[in-house]
């Protein structure tokens, strides 16, 4: 069996990346074509600069945060493993982890932001909560790029983006990945997030709070 590839080649450079948790016989890379598509789009459309305020959302193992670390991005995720992998991969590439601000799903990223990169999560409830909370951080000039693998992108993703953020423009599929550009529409009325869902456990005094992407 050939060893799994651990070096990602991107317009921003060459980066060593590994997944978490570590497995003796790892079968999967720490990035996918959707990560590569986002980084290619950034290289083509965004002029590098220290003043660009970047927010990365749902970065599985830190591929995006590592490649864009020179821009001091915020990395917003509900996964502790993602945070660990991001820190490990920053260190593995000689990058100070303090340069990337990790934000968990119960925290609100700082705004405003100029560039948002979103990897579509498996659970659309999480995406809905994130988009609603993201909206106040956007300006009319914010560039929002959304990506995922074609097989994991239901049509409801487009409907949700257009309802909560603005008009979408979909690029051609590339390496079985899809990229969506979103133009923020600040005139849209965005509802309050329905999360966390709260209910009282039958027969007890316990009030249960169920956050997006948490199952009970």
Give residue ranges: language-model regions:
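SAM-dependent Rossmann-like transferase core, predominantly class I methyltransferases
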Residues: 23-32, 37-45, 173-216
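Conserved class I S-adenosyl-L-methionine
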Residues: 28, 43-64, 216
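Conserved SAM-binding motif I beta-strand of class I
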Residues: 72-78
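A short acidic, Gly/Pro-enriched loop at the edge of an enzyme's catalytic core
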Residues: 102-120
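A short glycine-rich, Lys/Arg-flanked "PGG" loop and its adjoining helix->strand segment in the class I
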Residues: 127-143
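Conserved beta-strand signature within the Rossmann-like core of class I S-adenosyl-L-methionine
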Residues: 140-152
